[in-house]
From Swiss-Prot:
Name this polypeptide is given: Peptide chain release factor 1
InterPro entries in alphabetical order: PCRF, Pep_chain_release_fac_I, Pep_chain_release_fac_I_sf, Prokaryotic/Mito_RF, RF-1
Gene Ontology molecular function terms on file: translation release factor activity, codon specific
Native source organism of the sequence: Brucella canis (strain ATCC 23365 / NCTC 10854 / RM-666)
Principal location listed in the UniProt entry: cytoplasm
Pfam families the record matches: PCRF, RF-1
HAMAP family linked: Rel_fac_1 (MF_00093)
Length: 359
């Protein structure tokens, strides 16, 4: 039996009942929206707590029936038969409740900015960056998310030297946040006549999309420069200074957007800058909170090799959790659930271990 914080569970049940009561009393629209949001957040955990409470009561009744000598023999036999099944259900519900009580990542419900950059490996690295982007596009489509291209620099032989996109939908960041790091590919390039396996890499960064309320950027802390945007072959995209470079002076973070619309470039550059600053704050807070926990699923360091895609063997290996799957073709088609769920599970296990170490 898992030792669950009963006081915390009772508080949640009491708060949920209070919200239900307040919502039934026709509050003003602003109050109703806030109550509805909190109601939605608590619904899953409260539902599981109630299920667990009912199951424990059922188990108690069955145990009493089994141990009561005055109970009909047939009823006692039925209690003996049913009690183990109810106890199994309790064990599952206790695990569910335990996970639902874990501290929430405030960014989990946010949309994400996905950045993929070709690393070592030349032309092949750019092709692999393109393959990764298509993999995430297909995964997003399967989840019902929307992917919107922000900017792209194409590779000389296809793929991308760099591609940035926003991914919007329910639970986007919670699913994609463990994708940050170096992804390595081992395969025979199409241009390789000798059939030799080449190794190349691409770096993935997944940032929670930040809003003004999440991170403050003061006007005096940024410098905005405009320049001519150039296209393929160095040709000017247009005759105006449309490219925008925004530098965040305190951190030195620089963002460049070079599409045709200067207004759009500025808005998108600020969007990316805000996300990077917010992510930097999150990483700093996470590091201070628990170095031990970060080491479980990897540090989140963009230079950390997290996964290898071996095409000759048809396998993908996630080095952080020592998980190898022999279904590379399906993974590249966006079948990422097994990888993503395993990473989330490992993270939850680490959180539980950390909570268990607290006095």
């Amino acid at each position: 039996m898992i030792a669950l914080p009963q006081d915390r569970m009772d508080q949640l049940l009491k708060r949920f009942s209070m919200i239900e009561s307040q919502m039934a009393n026709n509050p003003d629209s602003d109050t109703y929206v806030k109550l509805a949001s909190e109601y939605s957040e608590l619904q899953d955990v409260v539902g599981k707590i109630r299920e667990l409470s009912d199951a424990r009561m059922e188990a108690s009744d069955l145990a009493a029936m089994r141990d009561d000598a005055s109970t009909d023999a047939e009823m006692r036999a039925l209690a003996v038969e049913e009690l183990p099944e109810v106890e199994k259900r309790i064990a599952v519900l206790e695990q569910d409740v335990q996970i639902l009580l874990l501290p929430k990542d405030a960014a989990d419900d946010k949309n994400a900015i996905l950045e993929i950059r070709a690393g070592t490996g030349g032309l092949e690295a750019a092709l692999f960056a393109g393959d990764l982007f298509r993999m995430y596009e297909r995964y997003a489509a399967e989840k019902g998310w929307r992917v919107e291209l922000v900017s792209a620099s194409e590779g000389d032989a296809g793929g991308y030297k760099e591609i940035i996109a926003t991914v919007s939908g329910k639970g986007v960041f919670s699913k994609l946040k463990f994708e940050s790091g170096v992804h390595r590919v081992q395969r025979v390039p199409e241009t390789e006549a000798g059939g030799r396996i080449h190794t190349s890499a691409a770096t993935v960064a997944v940032l929670p999309e930040a809003e003004d309320i999440d991170i403050e950027i003061r006007n005096e802390d940024i410098r905005i420069d405009t320049m001519r945007a150039s296209g393929a072959g160095g040709q000017h995209v247009n005759t105006t200074d449309s490219a925008v470079r925004i530098t965040h002076i305190p951190t030195g973070i620089m963002v460049v957007q070079a599409e045709k619309s200067q207004h759009q470039n500025r808005a998108r550059a600020m969007q990316i800058l805000r996300a990077r600053l917010y992510d930097m704050e999150r990483q700093k807070a996470e590091s201070e909170r628990s170095q031990a926990r970060r080491s479980q699923v990897g540090s989140g360091d963009r230079s950390e090799r997290i996964r290898t895609y071996n095409f000759p063997q048809g396998r993908v290996t996630d080095h952080r959790i020592n998980l190898t799957l022999y279904k590379l073709d399906r993974v590249m088609e966006g079948d990422l659930d097994e990888l993503v769920d395993a990473l989330i599970s490992d993270h939850q296990t680490a959180l539980l271990a950390e909570l268990g170490e607290q006095p």
